[in-house]
From Swiss-Prot:
Belongs to the globin family. The keyword Transport applies. O2 binds at H59. Heterotetramer of two alpha chains and two beta chains. One of its GO terms (biological process) is hydrogen peroxide catabolic process. Heme b binds at H88. Signal peptide: none annotated. This is Hemoglobin subunit alpha-1.
Length: 142
């Protein structure tokens, strides 16, 4: 999915605020995904799935850090996430259907925490960005 110049502007504007609290926002998105879609817990057999779990927060930070890194390479998201794509496809073998589920929950968390900044243009841009990241992360499955 091609990101327009306007999309890139909105992504660049909101990602630093998200990244500043990656453990909180990423953890909340993962927690929501685990509650709403329990089958996604399969890949985390040793996790404590309670709200504000340190394990979920730590993994949430990894997710947000990866998204922040991708946001610094909006013209080459595939290149910047190639190693992560390999990891998820070949080593972890994560169900590719989980990425859109997490993307949806990230949008929910961002909307809740940044209601003024999460206008329709930012919503569209972040949705396109997360869809692109999901596509990149599943590209090695084929």
């Amino acid at each position: 999915m091609l990101l327009s110049a306007d999309d890139k502007k909105h992504i660049k504007a909101i990602m630093p605020a998200i990244a500043a609290h990656g453990d909180k926002f990423g953890g909340e998105a993962l927690y929501r995904m685990f509650i709403v879609n329990p089958k996604t817990k399969t890949y985390f057999p040793s996790f404590d799935f309670h709200h504000n779990s340190k394990q979920i927060s730590a993994h949430g930070k990894k997710v947000v850090d990866a998204l922040n890194e991708a946001s610094n390479h909006l013209d080459n998201i595939a290149g910047s996430m190639s190693k992560l794509s390999d990891l998820h496809a070949y080593d972890l073998r994560v169900d590719p259907g989980n990425f859109p589920l997490l993307a949806h929950n990230i949008l929910v968390v961002v909307a809740m925490n940044f209601p003024k900044q999460f206008d329709p243009a930012t919503h569209k841009a972040l949705d396109k960005f997360l869809a692109t990241v999901s596509t990149v992360l599943t590209s090695k499955y084929r």
